């Protein structure tokens, strides 16, 4: 939301519960005036929080994590819920202060008590993971649900996931589907992708690969890497769309460049086998290595095989065995079989 005046900006800053990240001034020079306006009212918690954001993003003033923390702390000490949430984030990340998860838990708790949905969601994560507290999945779900009912996108997908997996609440695909729909209607990429998963598997709905592809594509176009990989897979296998290796590779590469581990392996396979492109063993090795280093066992096996046979690399039994061993530790059956052959023949 963009505004032409400071008064409009400040009105929406309060009305939208201090969501500074979605508010903008059309004229960048006006941020200096906004800073001066807020600084002149620095004894008020609302303006203390605003100064925290201005220092955080370096708008109207030189960016300073330390100054941002100081102003958020003043605002939080004066009862500002969103400033408390920001302090929680700072203590989690350990930016300009030493990381302190106990402090983060404390500030998230205080912020949650004041109804800040983002803090509720993050506090739910702490309870789910047992961070700075005893793990309590039921309490985590309750916090997710409160935040979701306030419209928090992350919490909405967390509630849906809890229902989908039966984590902290009885498994219920219908309720999971319901919450994913709400998230998708808000344009949340994770919810869109997850709704695609529900349609692909017929969870809480009639199975529809066409609908699944549609939601995967929407999420992919919003930049979600795992959705890009899913779109690539549908083109790869010809699921509800004509098989098209070029389109599959296009989406796999977009996902791989974002660090999606399965996409990295898939790109490696496409370059190894010349699917949608010409064979390029150098690129195959590059992507298998990226995926292998990220922990994908199948990519480790493919990379090991390249070294074993000298495909695109200098033949090296020792390096091949190292990759097979890494994959075997992750339970890959092919790697275990290959290691058996290695020891039998004395390779490596």
Which sequence ranges carry the predicted segments?
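Canonical positions in the second alpha-helix
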Residues: 37, 74-75, 110-111, 146-147, ...
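Residue-level detector of alpha-helical secondary structure
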Residues: 7-10, 35, 145, 196, ...
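Alpha-solenoid helical-repeat scaffolds
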Residues: 27-59, 70-77, 86
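Hydrophobic face of amphipathic alpha-helices that form TPR/SEL1-like repeat modules
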Residues: 48-57, 84-93, 120-129, 133, ...
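Short helix-capping/linker turns of helical repeat alpha-solenoids
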Residues: 40-48, 57-59, 64, 77-81, ...
């Amino acid at each position: 939301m963009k505004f032409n005046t400071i008064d409009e900006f400040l009105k929406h800053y309060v009305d939208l519960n201090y969501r500074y990240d979605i508010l903008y001034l059309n004229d960048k020079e006006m941020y200096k005036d906004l800073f001066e306006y807020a600084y002149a009212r620095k004894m008020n918690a609302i303006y203390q929080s605003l100064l925290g954001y201005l220092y955080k993003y370096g708008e109207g003033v030189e960016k300073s994590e330390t100054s941002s923390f100081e102003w958020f702390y003043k605002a939080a000490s004066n009862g500002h819920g969103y400033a408390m949430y920001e302090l929680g984030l700072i203590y989690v990340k350990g930016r300009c202060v030493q990381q302190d998860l106990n402090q983060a838990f404390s500030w998230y708790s205080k912020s949650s008590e004041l109804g800040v949905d983002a803090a509720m969601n993050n506090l739910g994560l702490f309870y789910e993971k047992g961070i700075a507290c005893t793990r309590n999945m039921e309490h985590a779900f309750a916090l997710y649900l409160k935040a979701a009912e306030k419209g928090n996108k992350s919490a909405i997908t967390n509630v849906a996931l809890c229902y989908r997996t039966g984590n902290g609440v009885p498994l219920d695909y219908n309720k999971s589907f319901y919450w994913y729909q709400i998230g998708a209607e808000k344009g949340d990429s994770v919810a869109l992708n997850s709704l695609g998963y529900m349609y692909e598997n017929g969870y809480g709905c009639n199975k529809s690969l066409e609908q699944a592809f549609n939601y995967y594509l929407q999420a992919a176009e919003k930049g979600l890497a795992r959705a890009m990989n899913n779109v690539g897979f549908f083109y790869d296998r010809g699921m509800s769309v004509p098989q098209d290796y070029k389109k599959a590779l296009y989406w796999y590469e977009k996902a791989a460049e974002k660090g999606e581990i399965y996409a990295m392996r898939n790109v490696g396979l496409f370059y190894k086998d010349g699917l949608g492109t010409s064979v390029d063993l150098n690129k195959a090795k590059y992507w298998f290595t990226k995926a292998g280093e990220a922990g994908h066992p199948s990519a480790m096996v493919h990379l090991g095989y390249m070294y074993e046979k000298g495909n695109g690399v200098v033949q090296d039994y020792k390096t091949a065995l190292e990759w097979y061993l890494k994959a075997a530790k992750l339970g890959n059956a092919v790697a275990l079989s290959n290691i058996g052959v290695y020891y039998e023949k004395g390779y490596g």
